[in-house]
Amino acid sequence: MAAVSAHMQDIKIQDQSDDDPYSPNTRDTTSPECHDDEKSEDISIRSSSFSIHNVLRRSGTTAALTMSFRRKSSWRIPNFDDRNTESVSPVVEVNEREISVDDGNSCCSDDTVLSVGNEAPVSNYEEKASQNTHQELTSFKHIQTHLSAISQLSQNMNVAQPLLLRPSPINPNPIMFLNQPLLFQSPILSQDLKGMPNRQTANVISPTFGLNFGMRLKANHETRTRSDENRYSKPEESRDYINQNCLKFSIDNILKADFGRRITDPLHKRKVKTRYEAKPAPAKDTAAFAPKLDEARVPDIKTPDKAGAIDLSKDDSGSNSGSTSGATSGDSPMVWPAWVYCTRYSDRPSSGRSPRTRRPKKPPGDTASNDEKRPRTAFSGPQLARLKHEFAENRYLTERRRQSLAAELGLAEAQIKIWFQNKRAKIKKASGQRNPLALQLMAQGLYNHSTVPLTKEEEELEMKARERERELKNRC
């Protein structure tokens, strides 16, 4: 309304001004007849039904209806890309038809003050209404862009960040709670979320973090991982600690080379000596339990000046084969790892834990029973020649080859197998080579078994070695 009143004042000023007497919008003001005509026209305008006030009222209501209808249509139709919102309601068309009636008393006639070129107020209202609708549309577009940016940000964060995160209720990020309400973020990741730029500010560096944000984030992560490593011990270290302190017979300790060695602490040795000297036991009664008892006792009651390996073959006759040869060889003898002691050599009955037992010889007058010994197999000349030829080709027979050879010679498979075993043993004995591992275990008293029977010379050598051991013990 203020614009309409200002426009009316401009019209009055134009009527009363004398600067432009020949303007087409004004009449000749010099004659008195002109003033009389203007007065009559003013009176007719005030008294007519299509007066200026009525026209302005109708135009105001039309603009208000147009604005309200456009607002409703913009809320109902969410098409923000269509900016040509020129839909006109039927009510507005009816009002415009009523206003634009072509008659002599109409406001659009040539006689009235508001001619066709003087319709500024209505156009001003329409321009304001269109501006308001455009502002509302732009505000909705801004809201839509903000929502899309937030959703894209949350999707990017979900892809870029790991899911296994420690929950931290100190500084939660509200953006992550849009799509994943159950996910908690740590403070470092929340700072990272705040520092991430949007699409609109992709080229702007955040003033809060600056260029050193990556280095600071890496330093914080390293300090946190170090504190976690110091706080929680590794399972392997704890397992080793348990094995070293509690489980003395664990697999790791058994496989070590120092497992089963004698104790080097002199105080502990003295205590163990006094404990076992107080309760001596006869050797004959405990000969059957010697393996278990000697394993637990011998490593502790060993004399401190002995620097050799452990001697586990204890008996009355002192029958051990070179048990202290490793002790006299040097200060640091070679010690085999503990898994060697768990092999088949120490599981045999004649491995040194018990004295070797031989069958007593019967007098020649007594006849041996038939169940005691199987009669010796006598091979013929062609059979022996065939067996020797086969042994020269291959010392070890397969099962199929043994079956074919037994069918060819008319012998049992067991006979052929035993003949090959005896032949290999004779060759091994004639060569004079022994297994170095067996020799080392025999020197330590852990292995006192030979696959072939001992000759008289070997027995004499063993007796001499035992006598030397006794002399050394007496000197000490």
From Swiss-Prot:
- List the biased-composition ranges (Polar residues): 23-32
Signal peptide range? none
What PROSITE patterns does the record point to?
Answer: ENGRAILED, HOMEOBOX_1, HOMEOBOX_2
Q: Where is this region: Disordered?
A: 1-43, 273-331, 347-381
Tell me the DNA-binding residue spans: 372-431
Family matches, as InterPro entries: Engrailed_Homeobox_TFs, HD, HD_engrailed, HD_metazoa, Homeobox-engrailed_C-terminal, Homeobox-engrailed_CS, Homeobox_CS, Homeodomain-like_sf
| Compositionally biased tracts (Basic and acidic residues) | 33-43, 292-305
Which regions are flagged for Low complexity bias?
Answer: 318-331
What are the GO BP annotations of this UniProt entry?
neuron differentiation
Where does the record say this protein resides?
Nucleus
Tissue-level expression = Expressed in the middle silk gland but not in the posterior silk gland during the fourth molt/fifth intermolt period.
Which keywords does the record carry?
Developmental protein, DNA-binding, Homeobox, Nucleus
Q: Which GO terms describe its molecular function?
A: DNA-binding transcription factor activity, RNA polymerase II-specific; RNA polymerase II cis-regulatory region sequence-specific DNA binding
Stored Pfam families: Engrail_1_C_sig (PF10525), Homeodomain (PF00046)
GO cellular component terms attached to this protein's record: nucleus
For this chain, the family text in UniProt reads:
Belongs to the engrailed homeobox family.
Function statement: This protein might be involved in the compartmentalization of the silk gland.
Q: What is this protein called?
A: Homeobox protein invected
Q: Which gene encodes it?
A: INV
